[in-house]
Regions:
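N-terminal helicase ATP-binding lobe
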Residues: 1-676
Length: 676
């Protein structure tokens, strides 16, 4: 019987291993499993960890990711690596690691490549299809549920048809990407496979969406097999509720006359009951993360920067600790900023206003090799587990590090803060333990996930807040400064206006979060408690409002309606409205090539003006130089060809493009887009 499992175990509790054991328990005689992750290099980490902890051999496990560079870097530093994915990267190719396999002869034509030397076998493709356990970026499997290059679509579909599906950290997808993932859930159910979804903050709204997708897949299976009824199991498990209480497991049956609304209500009630029990269990446990609100007199960028700086200084004073020699104090702090340009700008601000602090800016647009070595240092320094013997405090690695020793030795100050200013790349998948954090909030999820990087390994008892949240986030301050205070502020990343219903009633975190005496305990309860946390309620409203168009009875049911809409045969629904990877543009600049006279002087005027615009947006000097160089080439090409043809130039994990708009009323007008 197909089974849908929700695993809501806490962070660091071994969810990945439990997911695999659950899948093997559900199908003990012939386990074939796909573990799909949204994190490219974390896919490698997961594969390696499972291989060691579950004692798997190369002929039992295959790992697939999107590029060779990440694979090579990981292999060189396997012991220390634990990487999260960056903002919406492209996934152009897939590289597989694992033993070669034989497949049935009738499948061989699908796994052949034509080269100059003739037809050769695609051994990587065979590995992906035939291995018993596949650990993969979800980009590989996503083609099974949407129009794609047909060879890739068929290969991914064959793998999905023959495997049970594990979706780790399923709440890490934005609503558009979530719909793409739910199509996989629907297909897996249609082919009678088990689906296991896990996350420490798996909200009721998300669980309902997954349940609706699975239920619609079962309905498709019922129609396909022409059965009078089709049953499936549902289970909810976690590690927090008293082990004396068995996990919630029940069976739902679809018939020709099924009342899906009654079934859905039953699911909602049971899931909510479980969340209530989970919140009660969490409330009885010691809290290791306490947040404090930082009031702001005005919502301006300068006030926001000042508030973040003051917060960091306060937290350093609270949580700095003495080195072994006892002469100087240090701390490692995290400042979470929503977007790359804002993070870079804040790093410059800190460097100018807190000069004895050591600042590292960690973001997705850094050169790959730079980012890798930053991660290596952070992974080494911020692994702060205690063992009661050689590692009594968890700070031993930092105190014994030669670079840290030199920096402390040459510092003229008694207090030496080490500050990482990071974008959301730090939120998920990084096994780091910071002393404190300042959070530029984008959603409740961003607060809970970032807080999970504070006091993570040492789990010290705290008496004062070790996290500070400014009253307003950067984007709202920018909107106010531009006299657009009602513009969405919790976006890119964030959920505000996703369902296109209405904006949030306000952007004041003093009102959106359930503070008590200006303080707030941060754990999974904050994400689940929609009754007391307005922020969580609004986030869930947007997620549900978007998802119900595709799977809910209340919406259009584009992907679950028995009466198939013809739009399902078009690519736009998949690639434009519900893509897995949606490029979020950082900036949009208007250019009219017809107004540029041929010659270097006129081009330089455009380039210089663009340079000023980028600088105002907080773009750093080296980045601007790169953009300027490429912009000159683009403009020269536009003038030479008498039109603005599409040109793409890579920059780290991003790039930009100049393109001609087709509408007659803006003919000849071009737009320069920069994305990450």
């Amino acid at each position: 019987v197909p089974t849908l499992v929700f695993n809501i175990a806490g962070t660091g509790s071994g969810k990945t291993r439990m997911n695999l054991r659950t899948a093997c328990t559900l199908r003990p005689n012939d386990p074939r499993i796909c573990i799909a992750l949204n994190l490219r290099s974390l896919t490698l980490q997961t594969g390696d960890a499972l291989k060691k902890s579950m004692n798997l051999s190369d002929d039992e496990l295959a790992v697939v990711i999107g590029d060779n560079i990440t694979q090579e870097l990981f292999e060189k530093a396997k012991k220390n690596q634990g990487i999260d994915e960056d903002e919406n990267p492209p996934e152009p190719i897939f590289d597989a690691k694992g033993d070669d396999y034989d497949i049935p002869a009738w499948l061989n034509p699908l796994f052949e490549k034509t080269t100059k030397k003739g037809i050769i076998s695609d051994n990587d493709g065979k590995t992906l299809l035939a291995s018993p356990l596949l650990v993969s970026t979800i980009d590989y499997l996503i083609a099974a549920g949407e129009p794609h290059k047909q060879g890739h679509h068929v290969k991914a579909l064959l793998r999905l048809i023959s495997s049970d599906l594990i979706l780790d950290e399923i709440d890490g997808y934005d609503p558009k990407a979530l719909i793409a993932v739910l199509r996989l859930v629907q297909l897996a159910a249609m082919y009678g496979r088990h689906v296991i979804c896990s996350s420490a903050t798996l909200s009721k709204t998300l669980a309902i969406s997954v349940h609706r997708a699975f239920e619609s897949g079962i309905a498709m299976r019922q129609a396909l097999l022409n059965d009078d009824k089709q049953a499936f199991n549902i289970a909810i498990i976690d590690n927090e509720i008293d082990s004396k209480n068995p996990p919630k497991i029940w069976q739902q049956t679809l018939t020709q006359d099924s009342d899906t609304q009654a079934d859905d209500k039953n699911f909602k009630d049971i899931y909510q009951t479980h969340l209530n029990e989970l919140q009660l269990a969490l409330s009885k446990k010691t809290s290791f993360r306490l947040a404090e609100l930082k009031p702001m007199p005005k919502a301006t960028i300068s006030d926001w920067q000042q508030a973040v700086l003051e917060s960091a200084q306060i937290l350093h004073d609270r949580y700095a600790w003495q080195c072994q020699n006892g002469e100087k104090r240090l701390s490692f702090g995290l400042i979470r900023v929503a977007n790359i340009h804002h993070a870079i700008s804040l790093a410059h601000y800190f460097a100018n206003h807190w000069q004895h602090a050591h600042i590292a800016c960690y973001h997705a647009n850094d050169w790959r090799i730079n980012r890798f070595y930053k991660e290596q240092r952070l992974d080494t320094l911020l692994s702060r587990h205690k063992d009661g013997k050689k590692r009594k405090t968890g700070n031993e690695t930092i105190e014994q590090d030669s670079e840290i020793i030199e920096l402390m030795k040459h510092s003229q100050q008694k207090n030496v803060p080490f500050v990482v200013i990071a974008t959301p790349v730090e939120e998920v998948g990084r096994d780091h333990d910071f002393d404190w954090a300042v959070i530029d909030a984008s959603s409740v999820q961003s607060i809970v996930q970032t807080a999970g990087r504070v006091n993570r390994h040492r789990r010290e008892t705290i008496h004062e807040p070790n996290i500070i949240i400014p009253q307003f986030n950067y984007r709202h301050c920018k909107n106010v400064q531009q006299q657009k205070p009602k513009q969405p502020a919790f976006i890119y990343p964030g959920y505000e206006s996703y369902s296109q219903d209405e904006n949030y009633p306000n952007h004041d975190l003093a009102k959106l979060l359930p503070w008590q005496n200006n303080q707030l305990i941060i754990d999974a309860r904050l994400r689940f408690d929609k009754d007391n946390c307005l922020f969580a309620k609004l986030d869930d409203r947007e997620i549900q409002g978007f998802c119900e168009r595709y799977f809910y009875d209340e919406g259009d049911e584009l992907f679950s309606n028995a009466q198939v809409d013809s739009c399902l045969m078009t690519e736009q629904l998949y690639q434009t409205f519900t893509p897995l990877r949606d490029r979020q543009y950082q900036a949009l600049y208007r250019i009219n090539p017809n107004s540029i006279k041929e010659g270097e002087l006129a081009i330089e005027k455009y380039v210089n003006a663009f340079n000023v615009a980028l600088e105002k947006d907080g773009c750093c000097g080296n980045t601007r130089k790169y953009y300027m160089k490429t912009l000159r080439a683009v403009l020269n090409k536009a003038i030479k060809e008498k039109e603005a043809s599409v040109s793409t130039y890579p920059f780290g994990n991003g790039g930009f493009e100049i393109s001609k708009l087709e509408e007659k009323h803006v003919k000849g007008i071009c737009w320069l887009r920069i994305w990450t």
